[in-house]
Amino acid sequence: AGLSAQPFATPKQGELLTVLEKNGLIVEALLVDHTPVHPAVGYKFSYKGRSLLITGDTKQSSNIETLAHGVDLLVHEALAPNLVLKMHSAAKNAGNEGVAKIFVDILDYHASPAEAAQTAKNADVGHLLYYHIVPPMVIPGQEKLWINGAEAIFPTYTVGEDGVSFSLPANSEVIQQTASGL
């Protein structure tokens, strides 16, 4: 309602670029590494003493780690290499070389759950919310295979799904999950 896309300069490595400042809300863009796509950005939102950072599509990045330092909520995309490689093998065995190639290529420009967890730990964030889950969770028990030990690196996490939401009450340290999915 009333919003429209606006072009902005590409943020520099290690810097946040303010793209919106209104009524105490600050939205800043940051450069992320989604090679071969360039530029690619994530966003940091700050309001009344609270903050969250959404990575956008990216591989593990020291830039994210630096710019996410101390945020309340890190919303980080992640791809499970152990499962994607099984999908690669299945596509290859079925003779679908195009799909098999995609499954290998995407490993180069997405973070794994363990890499996102390491970023969250190193950045000293309050909570890690995984999103843009690859492959999607479609069967019971798949989350354990997907997370694949990353919980040992950063145990304060949620694997996102449609409808998951969080509240960060102003001027507090509370991180409250308000919905767990549809």
PLM region descriptions:
Residues 42, 48-53, 59-162:
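Cap/insert and terminal regions of metallo-dependent hydrolase folds
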Residues 2-69, 163-182:
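Core dinuclear metal-dependent hydrolase active-site scaffold
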